[in-house]
Regions:
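Walker B catalytic acidic pair
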Residues: 295, 301-302, 313
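Conserved inter-motif catalytic segment of the P-loop NTP-binding fold
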Residues: 240-274, 281-282, 388, 428-436, ...
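Short beta-strand elements
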Residues: 15-21, 278, 382-385
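Basic, amphipathic alpha-helical bundle interface domains used for macromolecular binding and assembly
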Residues: 31-42, 57, 64-74, 284-285, ...
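Catalytic P-loop NTPase motifs of RecA-like helicase/translocase cores
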Residues: 109, 300-307, 350
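Conserved alpha-helical scaffold flanking the Walker A/P-loop in AAA+ ATPase domains
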Residues: 203, 260, 265, 275-298, ...
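Walker A/P-loop
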Residues: 214-255
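Peripheral, non-AAA+ core regions of ATP-driven protein-machinery
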Residues: 3-213, 220-223, 261, 326, ...
Length: 506
């Protein structure tokens, strides 16, 4: 039996390749709930063996991929099947295989081609107690991220045979360790002139992991601000890097030269993206944009231009921090814990409420445009931010703006407070506070409580909006170094919830 791993979403599972050769008409069959791509492996493996000058005995050969009740898809089983046949031909000794796993697709000429999902499969092999894993050479740096298991990069089936025959050993890859800290990108908040209020709101959002909706006329700097958000977020932890890399590996988007992602993802899909493009999908479900943004940011520019089904599909993942894709063959769940940053114009022409330019839209057009963003989705934005046009004095000023590094220091201090507060729990920041501990971790003064009560009654806020105001106020208090939420902290949090009343219920 020769081991390799399969994939269901991000979850790797062990597959044992069993082989039997018996008397009878020469044949070669693969069983074990294999799909068409796996059954085609017979011809790839046959041709690869022939090209490598390896002859199979004239026998009836049956390959079983166990467990037989789990569907096997893809071409990742080729190398393990070939190794099983090599063992049957006495070209490999059992002692060399008992603690090894094999992953890779074979070409007709015997080359070993790269496959997707090597990192989660290597992690599973290490957890199983295996000491060696053989992967395509193009994937070996990805496998070398995992400690406690030797990763061998194989270029061809012939090279693997020489390795087993000890004619030309394959050297295991050195364990990959990122030599530099997380890269925060070349974009900097110092490039943005003016917009001090918007910068402060985004700093609060970064400090607490809050979702942000920006509304403003064209050219006010919404996209420019959003693209600089990763530069003020805290550096990724190693665990976050592994989670993020796993997702990109399964999606086939991992750069072979950068096997471990250390930069927070920034995904910005076009407004024509389909619901499946956002959530993930396909006959073999792959991660969508919301999962690719895991541990990072999802930026939706021109929010009102997205289709209603695409926007509504965000609602549940924003609450659950995971998305489940169901197919006839089963369900797959991907994580999607991300910050949502959205930007939109206030009307079709973009100039409703502009201080100098006249809006040419009718009230009905404005109302119809804004109604594309539903109330339930609007409720899931913690911070509503109006981005005003930049003043000429700010544009022409030669004064230096505050850098992202300086802002990031304050954000990190607030996150350190939160890390201490939520130590030993699955909560990572204030935006993730669950309702059962909300009042415990968000104590308020009597004055703050009265203000919150007045605001709740006067504005007719939903229970979700109330919770989000309290969470934002908790972040503002953390940035202020306060243990108890005061009136001024509530006032700032309420200020960040005013635009839904101005534009949607005005």
């Amino acid at each position: 039996m020769y081991k390799r791993q399969g994939l269901l979403g991000l979850n790797a599972f062990a597959v044992k390749v069993e082989i039997e050769a018996s008397k009878g008409l020469p044949s070669f069959d693969i069983v074990g709930l294999a799909d068409a791509s796996v059954k085609e492996s017979r011809e790839r493996v046959r041709s690869a063996l022939r090209s490598s000058e390896i002859t199979l005995p004239l026998r009836k050969i049956i390959i079983n991929l166990a467990p037989a009740d789990v569907r096997k898809t893809g071409s990742v089983y080729d190398l393990a099947v070939a190794v099983a046949l090599l063992r049957m031909a006495d070209l490999v000794d059992d002692s060399m295989l008992s603690t090894s796993a094999f992953i890779g697709e074979l070409s007709l000429s015997g080359e070993v081609r790269p496959v997707q999902g090597v990192l989660p499969m290597t992690i599973m092999a290490q957890k199983m107690g295996l000491s060696e894993i053989y992967v395509p050479a193009d994937n070996v740096r990805e496998a070398s991220v995992v400690e406690g298991i030797k990763a061998y990069g194989v270029r061809s089936l012939r090279e693997l045979v020489f390795h087993f025959e000890k004619k030309a050993a394959i050297v295991p890859a050195a364990h990959y360790k990122p030599t530099a800290e997380s890269y925060f990108g070349s974009l900097d908040f110092a490039d943005v002139k003016g917009q001090s209020a918007a910068k402060k709101a985004l700093e609060v959002a970064a400090a607490g992991g809050h979702n942000v909706l920006m509304i403003g006329s064209p050219g006010s700097g919404k996209s420019m601000l959003a693209k600089r958000m990763p530069s003020i977020l805290p550096a990724m932890t190693f665990e976050e890097s592994i989670e993020t890399t796993n997702i990109h590996s399964v999606a086939g988007l991992l750069d072979s030269n950068s096997p471990l992602i250390t930069t927070r993802p920034f995904r910005s899909p076009h407004h024509t993206v389909s619901p499946a493009g956002l959530s993930g999908g396909g006959s073999v479900p792959k991660p969508g944009e919301i999962s690719l943004a895991h541990n990072g940011l999802l930026f939706l520019d021109e929010l009102a231009e997205f289709s209603r089904p695409a926007l509504e599909i965000l609602r549940q993942p924003l609450e659950d921090r995971q998305v489940t894709i169901s197919r006839v063959s089963g369900s797959i769940t991907y994580p999607c814990s991300f910050m949502l940053i959205a930007a939109m114009n206030p009307c079709p022409c973009g100039y409703f409420g502009h201080p100098t330019r006249k809006c040419i839209c009718s009230p009905k057009q404005v109302s119809s445009y804004l109604s594309k963003v539903s109330g339930p989705l609007l409720d899931r934005f913690d911070i509503h931010l109006e981005v005003a046009p930049v003043e000429f004095a700010d544009l022409s000023s030669t004064a230096k703006e505050e850098s992202s590094a300086s802002i990031r220091e304050r954000v990190q201090k607030a996150r350190d407070i939160q890390n201490e507060r939520f130590k030993g729990t699955s909560i990572t920041c204030n935006a993730r506070i669950t309702s059962d501990i909300l009042h415990e971790v968000c104590p308020v003064t009597d004055e703050a409580s009265k203000l919150l009560e007045n605001v709740f009654d006067r504005l007719g806020l939903s229970a979700r909006a109330y919770d989000r105001i309290l969470k934002v106020a908790r972040t503002v208090a953390d940035m202020d170094g306060a243990k108890v939420i005061d009136k001024k902290h509530i006032a700032m949090a309420v200020q960040y919830r005013s635009l839904d009343r101005k534009y949607w219920n005005g």
